UniProtKB/Swiss-Prot annotation:
Name by which UniProt lists this protein: Probable D-serine dehydratase
Gene3D superfamilies in UniProt: 3.40.50.1100
Gene (name only): dsdA
Keywords: Lyase, Pyridoxal phosphate
Top-level taxon of the source organism: Bacteria
Length: 441
């Protein structure tokens, strides 16, 4: 399936299941050798290391302007935590053996903007700021970047504008970081963006432009608006390699976090990482970093709402960004606002298709159930998008075809580590979180 023949595509049995909003799990029929998979993009390990070096240069500045980063010396990072009670209760709920150990990656509680977007979004703003500052002679690569916290630097950056299209969290991270540096910022937000996120941005002086349409329209309009201003830099969530590399740094850093927790990752102790997927930049970048750090022993699996399975649809059909969920009759309406994306990134889909084991869809009903369980069992509050990874553990443990295709035996499954990548929730106001929990009842 490589041409857009919608009629033929809609006869496919998996597409029929997607059209019916069913929860499905689809995986690549056989694993691609990692060396081959990594060659699908021109990006390399050196590019990820360059991104980490840039974040290190900015650490003194970040530590100075964000009090919450003082304890980490300006490093934006989240912890991994064991979730044994969640594992016990979910295993009973799924009627599966509680194999391996379950962990949660708390990007939901990343400092500054409380979501995974604090990685890619903030990194791209910093990369752009550095480029401008170096060119203007405000800093050199050897300087302490904390000197960018000055009226002179803010005045300089105010001559420039940053624009982005977002369903919410990316706009939040880019808006907060850009405003702190002194940039003028416009965030073009889709209809499904939460009101509190818009209110937060406006309180920082960010220009929020609202659309009655979905994410794709917000991005397109943001791109058009930026074209008319030569001093406006548009952050393109669909195609940005800079965003992608900002996320990839997390993959490299996770390796050390696993070592610190005495978590073994090798042929007999596989690591399964479950990543919620919207347009694809966040999970794609993280997976790219993970594959460079841990090789074939890490299995990355993407989770999408039943109403918005854009990456699964793009990769499965081979059409990537040439097809959207509306083409098969889906409405792209989900409580998981961060995942309400109708058309996947073609760049990410093509770059990562041989490195991702599989893709599954999850209903809003299950999302709310897992929000409730995570709150009750671990006292961790997450937004709907952030719990999408939970259902993946069920698929890995019960899908015999997947286990055979990826040569996973009973001992490996017993020794496995399952990491649910929680993508957001830390900045959700208490009254909004109560609404989520009420919907779970």
């Amino acid at each position: 399936m490589t041409t857009l023949n919608i009629q033929a595509i809609q006869q496919d049995s998996l597409i029929k299941s997607l059209k019916n909003y069913e929860e499905i799990f689809w995986f690549q029929p056989e694993p691609t050798p990692i060396e081959q998979g990594l060659k699908r993009t021109s990006l390399t390990l050196a590019d990820i290391q360059d991104a980490e070096a840039r974040l290190t240069r900015f650490a003194p500045y970040l530590e100075k302007v964000f009090p919450e980063l003082r304890s980490t010396q300006g490093k934006i990072e989240s912890e991994i935590v064991s979730i044994p009670t969640m594992q016990h209760d979910c295993s009973k709920r799924f009627a599966i053996e509680p194999n391996g150990t379950w962990w949660l990656k708390k990007d939901s509680h990343l400092p500054i903007s409380g979501s995974i977007k604090a990685r890619g979004g903030i990194y791209e703003v910093l990369a752009h700021a550095e480029k401008l500052a170096l060119k203007a002679g405000l800093v050199t690569l050897q300087d302490n970047y904390s000197q960018l916290d000055s009226d002179q630097a803010r005045q300089f950056f105010s001559n420039y504008q940053i624009a982005v299209g977002s369903t919410g969290n990316l706009g939040l991270s880019i808006g907060i970081m850009s405003a702190k540096l002194g940039f003028r910022v416009s965030v073009h937000m889709s209809a499904d963006a939460r009101q509190w996120k818009k209110d937060k941005l406006r309180s920082l002086g960010v220009n929020v432009v609202e659309y009655a349409s979905d994410y794709g329209v917000a991005v397109e309009q943001g791109r058009k608006a930026a074209e008319s201003d030569p001093n406006c830099f548009f952050i393109d969530d669909e195609n940005s390699t800079t965003l992608f590399l900002g996320y990839a740094v997390a993959g490299l850093r996770l390796k050390q976090q696993l070592i610190d927790q005495n978590i073994q990752v090798d042929a007999e102790h596989p690591l399964f990482v479950y990543l919620p997927c919207g347009v694809g930049g966040g999970p794609g970048g993280v997976s790219f970093g993970l594959k460079h750090a841990l090789g074939e022993h890490v299995h990355c699996i993407f989770a999408e709402p039943t109403h918005s399975p854009c990456m699964l649809l793009g990769v499965y059909t081979g059409l990537h960004d040439q097809i959207c969920v509306a083409d098969i009759g889906l409405d792209n309406a989900t409580a998981a606002d961060g995942l309400a994306v109708g058309r996947a990134s073609g760049f990410v889909g093509r770059a990562m298709q041989d490195l991702i084991d599989g893709y599954y869809t999850i209903s809003d009903q299950h999302l709310f159930e897992f929000i409730r369980l995570m709150d009750q069992t671990q006292s961790i509050q997450l937004e709907p998008s952030a719990v999408a990874g939970v259902l993946g553990i069920y698929h890995v443990n019960t899908n015999k075809s997947y286990q055979q295709a990826y040569h996973l035996n009973a001992i490996q499954l017993k020794n496995a580590t399952h990491l649910i990548w929680a993508t957001g929730g830390g900045m959700v106001p208490p009254n909004e979180m109560q609404k989520y929990l009420k919907q779970c009842e």
